[in-house]
Amino acid sequence: MLTAEELERKKKKDEKAREKESKKLRALEKAELKAKQVKDEENPKKSTKKSSQRDAAHEENPEDFVDPETPLGERKRLSSQMAKQYSPAAVEGAWYAWWEKAGFFTADAKSSKPAFVMVLPPPNVTGVLHIGHALTTAIQDLIIRWKRMSGFNVLWVPGMDHAGIATQTKVEKNLKDRELTRHDLGRDEFIKEVWEWKEKNGSTILTQLRRLGASLDWSRECFTMDEQRSRAVTEAFVRFYKEGLIYRDIRLVHWDCHLKTAISDAEVEHKDIKEKTLLNVPGYDKPVEFGLITSFAYPLEGGLGEVVVATTRVETMLGDTAIAIHPDDARYTNLHGKFAVHPFNGRKLPIVCDGELVDPEFGTGCVKITPAHDPNDFELGKRHNLEFINVFTDDGKINTNGGADFTGMPRFAAREAIVEALKNQGLYRGEQSKEMRLGLCQRTSDVIEPMIKPQWYVNCSTIAKEALDAATSDENKKLEFIPKQYAAEWRRWLENIRDWCISRQLWWGHRIPAWYATLEEDNLREFGAYNDHWVVARTEEEARREAAEKFPGKKFDLAQDDDVLDTWFSSGIFPLSALGWPDETDDFKAFYPTSLLETGHDILFFWVARMVMMGMKLSGDVPFSKVYLHPMIRDAQGRKMSKSLGNVIDPIDIIKGQEGTIPECGADALRFALLSYTAQSDKINLNILRVVGYRQWCNKLWNAVRFALIRLGDGYSPPLALSPETMPFSCQWILSVLNKAVAKTVESLNAFEFSDAANAVYAWWQYQFCDVFIEAIKPYFGAAGDNSPAERAHAQHALWVSLETGLRLLHPFMPFVTEELWQRLPSPENSERKASIVICDYPSAMENWTNEKVETEMETVLASVKCLRALRAELLETQKNEKLPAFALCENNVTSEIVKSHELEIRTLANLSSFEVLLKGEHSAPSGSAVETVNENLKVYLTVGRAINVEAEQEKIRNKIAELQKQKEKLQKIMSASGYEEKVPANIKEDNVTKLANILQEFDFFENESARLAAETGQFRK
């Protein structure tokens, strides 16, 4: 069996060959088309009727082999005749609807089988399938189908995420096309509009998941905004608040001025800017300059001079409340305790000493401080008790705090106006290019503005410690990461965790279950002015009761917070809510905690950590015991997929094909290709040619089954049990290597090594079943008298068992083609056949099938065949399929007996007219023959007559002799080294003596071969 490295090298070689062949075919098609056009122009009236009839006779329509009358949801009606070619569209039609309707994917909460549970990472309701979803689906469905076939009560829960920002943005865009805004509709009508959009468009991705074959339990489909999930979200919020884990505070947030909401860290993309760069920003007619740092002076109070500061966001100077210097900077000792004066509003800016923020070696050593608009300045502002002045409105305009000259200006227009104002006052000191990282909203591409806002937060310190211990504690470890290296990243995230901002200024989402009580006696009437006036409850009625208890005897007005929760909050409890929590449902009792979470490593913190933190706090247990994190997909050149690069791959385009660029590959080939890539560290460089290669491989499987069905015949009845030891050699061998493939596949699946599992299945089908076994058993189906009925029956049984087992082994990887082919196989008499391969048992290793002796002997057979094929390719320029005589030259009786006993297999696989086995000294090589060494005990000769290129053979032998000479000299040098006899162990010295003897023997042999060929050359010349 090929090693993983050898198999990967072979696949890459095959890909290159396919790429080369593809280019040749495109060039040929182009040339043929051009020639046809020329011909048509020369003979416009010439009839093509005969050629059309001839072509039609050879072409098949895939639809002819699927009964179009199969009602949706019924078992597929296969044609009696099997198509000659595999067609993904024909094969993948109808099966899924039947699987779903038959209930093969439905779990039973009352089952006595062991449970295996996963939740599908809920895709956005706005989403369409992308290649990352395809990878997730391929991996998860592989695991689910394997576990289902392995006797587990499998539950795979599908769900959709309401995707607050993405969905609201999508619906607002639709409203804009109708010249409306959400404010024109009002909150209730807008929410109604979103629900209508969701019902109409929201299930696209779920339909596409079916196209990929995802065997989800659709009877348990859920949506993060449905009634049950919404109740769970409210319950989680209330419990966290009552335990002091949720609080309200005024802090800096990532603010999207276009959406007018705070966004999460996960929704911020960072763009590295090397120099002055123009970028388009939503809401601006012309591009905005970034990558510049502007220097300007602040005059010092009392005419003491000035201090020069620099910033990439000069518009924020309107909110500056201090200048910071390093306490040890001797240049500014005289400024300790002094003030600068703001040039536009006269505000006194204290000069504060701060060794934590200020680097005296950077720039002038003076730093402008805007506590309300910069994270570092915010912390410094708290340390020095500075004033926090917000100068932006929610939509990114300058507010009244910025001064009358700039009020109402968009922030980047104000940037230009402020520079002009500084120039007019003689305070502008210039600008230069500056490398910077710019935060952009991934949804809108708006430039993120740090803004100080009152928001709701989760205190993560204690729950993060529990989540960290669950994965790293030696005593209480409950959580395992695969691959293991992500445990270190888990530690890094959770040891440095910050409190989580969970409120969003949107309308679509879970409205925060918090009500503000405005008391009749309150001096400040602004909503939210008093932090202790909030009550958190499950319903408004409950909130009124709590407010009455909190403010006894006082009159109050109650109003619910307009904000909604961060989408990650509802996603964070999805393993709980998907199973019915907070109710003790049958599903929750049977299936929680889940068994495994599979997702991309890019959301380890944003989703996985939050699920573990929230799940442990709310249920007392981890929501899953294992986390498998898959790689991120890149293009063939290793580049991140993006619309700007034009390298985004739509998996549906691969499945259906795209005219002129991608051939129709089908879901099976795409799934298998993605699974075969999973060994590539943390990134997958996807080459479409590999998918194309697996689509071609599906055709090979198809033809293998066609061959088998012909050989089995209509009346064949498979056996209920097998006795391999009574079977012919090739049959014993295929069962033995199949057994090993089964063991390797199961071992790899258990270890989450999906690429190795795919390679094990592929290698058996491709290199052992198709390339060897099918060819080796052809003599048993030859003319009557060439074989015994018993041998023919054994070959049929081994063929059927190999196919049936191999299809079950492959099914979780390629569900559609395996179902189609398995349904065509005959079944044993007097046995109850399962309705579908979906619910069959997954293969397990059979103790009596493994035969090491047979496998070792087959290695000799295949090595001999490989050498004979190499000689054929080397010696024959034409008639390469001509049957030729050959013989084996054996060094000893043991080798001779092995080769003699397998003469039929060698003759068949090497396409020989005869094959003679001789002991050394019993032969004289015939003229026109060439030799190849199989191993130290065996050489094979192929006789091609005078067609042999003697000079080429001589050159090959000279190279072989030169190589042997190098080996001899190297070994002799080792054996003659000082201290060799005294220091080298006896067994190694003995091995070296044997190696040297073999080298000398080979040396003599090829010297004699060279002499023989020289004599032949002379004979031919005569």
Predicted regions, residues:
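Glycine- and acidic
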Residues: 77-82, 121-129, 187-191, 216-223, ...
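Feature 926 captures the class I aminoacyl-tRNA synthetase adenylation module centered on the KMSKS loop
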Residues: 295, 496-569, 573, 617-667, ...
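Active-site-adjacent bridging/hinge elements
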Residues: 112-120, 142, 175-181, 206-213, ...
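Structured ligand/cofactor/substrate-binding pocket environments in proteins
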Residues: 132-144, 160-161, 229-232, 249-250, ...
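Short helix-capping/linker segments at secondary-structure and domain boundaries
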Residues: 243-246, 579-585, 615-623, 680-682, ...
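Catalytic cores of large soluble enzymes that bind and process phosphate-bearing ligands
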Residues: 83, 87, 91, 131-135, ...
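Short acidic-hydrophobic surface loop/beta-edge motif
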Residues: 294-301, 338-343, 439-443, 515, ...
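N-terminal, positively charged nucleic-acid-binding surface of large information/translation enzymes
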Residues: 2-328, 356, 370-402, 411, ...
